[in-house]
Each structure stands twice: as C-alpha cells, then as structure tokens.
C-alpha cells in the first residue's frame, strides 16, 4: 500500500503537481487527521497525514491523479461545552475542495450528535471531494476593469436568468454555459449592462427543513464548499469549472464584468442541531464564533457565524477570494451580511479580514461590494465600511419607494438620496460610486410587485406567510394583485417608469434586478429563496419589450451625462447639478422640507429631470433655453421645443437643451 510522504503545508487544499497530490488541512485542536481516499468501487483507504506544521496537517500521495475522491476524518476531543465536536466516524469535506461528488441530503448519518456523539460511520453516503486539474487556456482574456463611474450592475440568478429563454438551446438553459451564449451576451450589451452580479455559485446545500417540505434552497445562501462550483448549474458536474471559465471569458470579450455574491458569514452546518459536513468536525472552536456555553453566536440568522477574526479563518477566506479571482478571473464580489467580516466581535474598519483584503495586491484591485449589516446588536453598518468597499444603499431603496409610492418623503430627503447619499458615504476619501443604489434586489418584491401588492404573499414558502419583511413601501394602486383596468395598468406603468428613472439617473452605482426591465412578477412573494420554479425563473416569452426598451434608453442616457459618470461629489456651483422648483427657481428651505413634491434636477447644465410627484397635473416652467424631451420620454425625430411641461400626476420627464 502506498505510503504518504510528508508533503508541504501550503497551499491549502488538494493540489496535483503532475506526479501526485499534496493534501493540507488546518486544525488547531485536532489530535490526528486521516486522509480517506475512495477507489472506483467506493472502497476506502485511510492514511494518517504525517506532516504537522503549526496548525496545518499535510501529506503527499504519490501517483494520485485528478479525479481522485477523498475526505477527512479528524480525531480530537468531544467537549461540546468547550466548543469541540470532533467525531472521526464522520467523513468531512475539505473546506478548500474544488469539486464535490454526491448530494447533501437530509440523512441521520450526516449528523454528529448534539450532547452525545453519534458514532455511526457515514462514509457510504457522505459527499466526497474530488481532486481537479487547474489548467485552463484563458487565451488573451483580460478583465474589463470598467470604471466605477461607468458601472451598471445587473443582479441575476444563474438558473433563473436563462432557464426559460426560448432562444438559448434547451440543453444548456439554466447553466453556466448559457451565461456565455451569444443571445444572453447580446441582450446584456443592448441593455447597457457592464457587470453581471451572480447570486451564489459556490457549492451550497438545501436546509433539512426545506428538504422535508419538498422545497430547496434556490438562492444559494447556504454554503458548504466555498471553492467548489455548484454542480447543478453545470451541463456536467465534471466540466463545471471549464463551463464557468468559458462563460467568464465570453463575457469579458464583450466588456462585461462578473461579480460573485459570496457568503463568508456562515455555513450550511447551521445550529448545533444541524448537519455535520466540514468545519464543525475539523475545528469547530476556531472556525465559528462560540459562546461561553459552547453554543454558537447566531449573528446571521442561520444558526452559526464564521469567526473572521481568527487568523486561520482569515487565511481561509482570503485564499477563497483569491482563488475566484486568480483561477476564474472574476472581477469582484458582493459580500452577504458583510458586517460579519468586520466583527472582532464588535465591528471595526481595521478588522483582520478587511486588513488582509486591503493589503492583498490581488483583492485590493477588484470590485468589493458589502451588504452592510448583520442581525447582531450593532449590525447595521451602512456607510462604515473601509474605503475599498462600495455598499448596498438601502437608504436609496426606501427613499425612492416612499417618494413615488407612499408620497411621504420631503424633497430634501429625496434629493439627498439622489445625490449618492453624501451624508452617509462622503467620508474617508470615498467616491459617489460607494453608494450601490437599488430599488429592488433578489430579496424583497420585484419592481412589478412593488406596484401591484401592498402585502407579501409568501404562503408557498411553508411558514404561513411569517417570513419576509413587512416593510415593503409598496403600493398596489387600489387593487391587490396583477391585472386590472387599463387605467390601473397605466398608473402602475408610470410608477415603474418613475422608479427606474430615479434609479438609473441618480448619482451612485445603479444595480438593476434581472427581470425588472421586462415586468417579472413573483406574485407578491418577497422572500422567494426556496422557490426553484416558474415563480422565480424569468419568463422571456411574457417580457414587456416596451419596458425593456425604456430601461435600455435610460441606461444609455445615463452614460451621456457627465455629472453621473465622472464619479465626483457634486458641489454647489460646479455645474454638475442645480435643484429647482416648478418655476425654475432655487428651492427655499421651506420648499425642501414642506413644499409640494415638484422638483427639477438640472444635470451637467443640459439634462433636466422634471418631476411632478403630486396627485394633480401640474404646469412646470422649465429653465431658460430650448428644451426638448428625449428618449425614452420622446422619439428621437422631430424634437418639439418646449418651455413649459404639463406634468401628469406622479410623472416625470427628461429634457435636453
């Protein structure tokens, strides 16, 4: 039987060098680590890792080849009160594995025990890691490096984006390969998108609770192997990495960046009653934030929280991010519940992971976007991330909805959000692009549902409609649900146009939710994380071509306005912006706070957004000059010069002179 050589303590994971495979695993509290390899018949061969350098266990298996399936058994104390839950009866996933073979089913053997260990062996049913080859011909691929000021983000789900697309071959719909199909790329280009932001693509598992209800985790925010691609999005699990790289290479050739939504805040092992897949059995005490009683700090709402202040966990997270950039050429990350990244346990801008990213020559050069909160005390950190990070701007989301759908936001507050929320983000040398402006995202109502539903309708999620937020700032315009009279449909359309215009012509970085540009509805479900069906898949056959054209025209208009693309804070008198009332005069203090919802925003001295957010048709006197409405508010031919705009109720128009 082949013996393991000592091997090397770096890099983490399993790496083939042409002659064999080097295996490394971190565990500060293990007493012994066994590498378990499986032949084609499923027979297991165990080897003690002979190398032990600091807290890294390592060994080298000569003659091992790519395709080898493996896992670990980690020996150590079972002391739950101290945070130790070692159980060598359970086969564990390598945290740095790049491919997984098998499914994460709800099986009693995949649990380690709560107070007492479960010593039933689970190797027969446990998922296995697979050694992969890193080689790929990137040809002349280069990152687009779109300037922040020119960036338009499109948030999409790999499967949901293309699964029902009639012009994409059936056999690749809903896959990584479909992302790089010419039909999809041409659509994104025509729309004006510069960055495709994908919901999680790292291997994830469906929560046991969902499996028991016949549901699955659709969004993917339940990670189990952060270096491995989710195989369900591949035409073949064995070619997932190749397919993903092909898609990125094709998108890059079209000038489109790829941003990954990544989950570094918790794992699919959930709470102490959850399954045992990897980290809990490798070194529970190091990987997670542990309370004094041995339970987890649940700052994520998912049962556990990764301890991203521990040096080894910082190294793990940093290596993961570098892997996606260096090996897959991704252009950036959106970090889920990113306040966890800064916990020490209190939130700090100089937290270890932030510092590691700042000092990394690779990670400091890509786009970094934070979801700037978690659910723990002090978890709301909007505006407080380090300068390299942009942040989801929920202030903008709520303000846009309140202004156009609830009619209860003063002009001053609206203008502040329109101007990249400078009161929040203009600090520490940050630029307006730090504000990621959004009206909708994957969680919450779609744009169409914002104007069709006053209340969430999440019954299909199996929680009796308790899940999902109740603070939607939506307006059904008089009737709950889709459909209605022609007048109702037109009023809803006008509200959608107003919200899209506010999003795409405001200062900051706009993010558009995939499907909003053609009227996708989730029928009032504002938490469709477990709906892998036609509720969430984009139905391209029902897409509104008129709304898509309207959205594309707005995006292309944005790119023509220097005040929006130059990424500089607006200052009084700099020619970037002037705020005027309905008579084309500067607003008084009283008008800002208590005046009617009528406003003119003059950008770059030649583009004018005229707003009438009142209930009545209102005459708006435009500033001096020859103004004409421009697409998408008027045709390009035979522009009509006007000095006064008859603003419809809850309407707006864009002019140029």
Curated annotation (Swiss-Prot):
Sorted UniProt keywords: Carbohydrate metabolism, Glycogen metabolism, Glycosidase, Hydrolase
Statement: the UniProt record of this protein carries the keyword Ribonucleoprotein: no
GO molecular function: glycogen debranching enzyme activity; hydrolase activity, hydrolyzing O-glycosyl compounds
SMART domains in the cross-refs: Aamy (SM00642)
Reactions catalysed: Hydrolysis of (1->6)-alpha-D-glucosidic linkages to branches with degrees of polymerization of three or four glucose residues in limit dextrin
EC number: 3.2.1.196
Pfam family, one: Alpha-amylase
Protein's pathway: Glycan degradation; glycogen degradation
PANTHER family assigned to the protein according to its UniProt record, in alphabetical order: GLYCOGEN DEBRANCHING ENZYME
Sites annotated Transition state stabilizer: 443
Similarity remark: Belongs to the glycosyl hydrolase 13 family.
Protein name: Glycogen debranching enzyme
SUPFAM superfamilies listed in its UniProt record: (Trans)glycosidases, E set domains
Keyword Hydrolase: yes
General function of this protein: Removes maltotriose and maltotetraose chains that are attached by 1,6-alpha-linkage to the limit dextrin main chain, generating a debranched limit dextrin.
Encoding gene, per UniProt annotation: glgX
Renumbered residue ranges of the record's region Disordered: 460-479
């Amino acid at each position: 039987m082949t013996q393991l050589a000592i091997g090397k303590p770096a890099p983490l994971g399993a790496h083939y060098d042409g002659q064999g495979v080097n295996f490394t695993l971190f565990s500060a509290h293990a007493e012994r680590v066994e590498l378990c390899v499986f032949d084609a018949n499923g027979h297991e061969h165990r080897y003690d890792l002979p190398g032990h350098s600091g807290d890294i266990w390592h060994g080298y298996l000569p003659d091992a080849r790519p395709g080898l399936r493996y896992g670990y058994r980690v020996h150590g104390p079972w002391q739950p009160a101290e945070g130790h839950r070692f159980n060598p009866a359970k086969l564990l996933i390598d945290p740095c594995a790049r491919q997984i073979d098998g499914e994460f089913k709800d099986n009693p053997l995949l649990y380690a025990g709560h107070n007492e260990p479960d010593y039933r062996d689970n190797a027969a049913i446990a998922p296995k890691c697979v050694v992969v080859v890193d080689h790929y011909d990137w040809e002349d691929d280069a990152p687009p490096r779109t300037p922040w000021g020119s960036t338009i983000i499109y948030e999409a789900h790999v499967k949901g984006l293309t699964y029902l697309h009639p012009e994409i071959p059936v056999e690749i719909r809903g896959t990584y390969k479909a992302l790089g199909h010419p039909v999809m790329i041409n659509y994104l280009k025509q729309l004006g998108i510069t960055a495709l932001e994908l919901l999680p693509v790292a291997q994830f598992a469906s929560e046991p609770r969902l499996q028991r209800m016949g549901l699955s985790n659709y969004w993917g925010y339940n990670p189990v192997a952060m270096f491995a691609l989710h195989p369900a999005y591949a035409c073949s699990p064995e070619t997932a990495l190749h397919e993903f790289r092909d898609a990125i290479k094709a998108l890059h050739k079209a000038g489109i960046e790829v941003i990954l939504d990544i989950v570094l805040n918790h794992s699919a092992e959930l709470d102490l009653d959850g399954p045992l897949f990897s980290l809990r059995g490798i070194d529970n005490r190091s990987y997670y934030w542990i309370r004094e009683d041995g339970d987890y700090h649940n700052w994520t709402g998912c049962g556990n929280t990764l301890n991203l202040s521990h040096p080894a966990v910082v190294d793990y997270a940093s290596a993961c991010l570098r892997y996606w950039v260096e090996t897959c050429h991704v252009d950036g990350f959106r970090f889920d519940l990113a306040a966890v990244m800064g916990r020490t346990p209190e939130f700090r801008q100089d937290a270890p992971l932030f510092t590691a990213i700042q000092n990394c020559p690779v990670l400091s050069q890509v786009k970094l976007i934070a979801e700037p909160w978690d659910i723990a005390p002090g978890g709301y950190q909007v505006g407080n991330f380090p300068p390299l990070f942009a942040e989801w701007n929920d202030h903008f989301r709520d303000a846009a909805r309140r202004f156009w759908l609830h009619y209860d936001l003063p002009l001053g507050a609206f203008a502040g959000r329109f101007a990249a929320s400078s009161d929040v983000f203009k600090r520490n040398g940050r630029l307006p692009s730090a504000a990621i402006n959004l009206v909708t995202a994957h969680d919450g109502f779609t744009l169409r549902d914002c104007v069709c539903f006053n209340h969430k309708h999440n019954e299909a999620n199996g929680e009796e409609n308790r899940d999902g937020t109740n603070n939607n700032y939506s307006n059904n315009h008089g009737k709950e649900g889709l459909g209605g009279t022609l007048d109702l449909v037109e009023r809803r359309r006008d509200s959608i146009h107003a919200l899209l215009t506010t999003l795409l012509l405001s200062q900051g970085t706009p993010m558009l939710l995939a499907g909003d540009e053609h009227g996708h509805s989730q029928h009032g479900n504002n938490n469709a994380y477990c709906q892998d069906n036609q509720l969430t898949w984009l139905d391209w056959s029902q897409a509104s071509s008129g709304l898509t054209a309207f959205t594309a025209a707005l995006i292309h208009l944005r790119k023509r306005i220097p005040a929006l693309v130059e990424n500089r804070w607006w200052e009084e008198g700099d020619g970037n912006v002037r705020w005027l009332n309905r008579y084309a005069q500067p607003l008084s203090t009283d008008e800002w706070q208590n005046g009617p919802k009528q406003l003119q925003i003059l950008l770059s001295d030649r583009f004018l957004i005229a707003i009438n957010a009142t209930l009545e048709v209102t005459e708006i006197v435009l500033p001096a000059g020859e103004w004409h409405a421009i697409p998408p508010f008027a045709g390009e031919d035979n522009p009509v010069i006007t000095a006064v705009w008859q603003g419809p109720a809850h309407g707006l128009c864009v002019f140029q002179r």
